[in-house]
């Protein structure tokens, strides 16, 4: 079983951008989301991780644009950002994406999240955005600016709800090119039977090989963003290294 790579396309104000540690205002633009997503498809991606940053930060949305991008792609799409009620969830699923990633909503509205998981099963993943504070694993919500509670308590609840997949991000690592938090990934894998997608910190092929080493523990994939855009390695190189 090889590691699945999900190149990220983060969208703000209709453009593909990258952030540093999820901070609003730290965007670097990379042009059209459509072109970025199609480029990853042409380079051999089987998945694209597509994020509506404006919706995630609660400052508008790129819903129509993202629906068009999903429609043009032949590969599977994981859609994320601002999916926190029936309206945004149904709109996201209606794009034809393979699955959606719930973030803040899963923390703030447990009942709604449980219903979404029960109704849509495999098409729902939950994003666990973790910041380590004084040795405690705390979750972050609303574009990473609010506290979302203790990681292990929330994970226990989501396990009871039957969540099919988790996207785990160490917020301190995201967009920094400082390497992934392998210990966090390993600990989450030990606490769930569900597959885990790693996110944040990948800076070199070696990081992906290290994450691939956790596949037997339950890591299924890795989201890669800034390292690809910054030219640290190409997607074909990365795919070859983890096959």
Swiss-Prot record:
EC number: 5.3.1.16
Pathway annotation from the record: Amino-acid biosynthesis; L-histidine biosynthesis; L-histidine from 5-phospho-alpha-D-ribose 1-diphosphate: step 4/9
Active-site residues, record numbering mapped to chain: 10 (proton acceptor), 129 (proton donor)
Short name of one Pfam family: His_biosynth
Any coiled-coil regions, as ranges: none
Principal location class: cytoplasm
Catalytic reaction list: 1-(5-phospho-beta-D-ribosyl)-5-[(5-phospho-beta-D-ribosylamino)methylideneamino]imidazole-4-carboxamide = 5-[(5-phospho-1-deoxy-D-ribulos-1-ylimino)methylamino]-1-(5-phospho-beta-D-ribosyl)imidazole-4-carboxamide
CDD domains: HisA (cd04732)
Keywords from the named record: Amino-acid biosynthesis, Cytoplasm, Histidine biosynthesis, Isomerase
Gene Ontology biological process: L-histidine biosynthetic process; L-tryptophan biosynthetic process
Subcellular location: Cytoplasm
HAMAP family: HisA
Protein's name in the database: 1-(5-phosphoribosyl)-5-[(5-phosphoribosylamino)methylideneamino] imidazole-4-carboxamide isomerase
Lineage: Bacteria, Bacillati, Actinomycetota, Actinomycetes, Mycobacteriales
Underlying gene: hisA
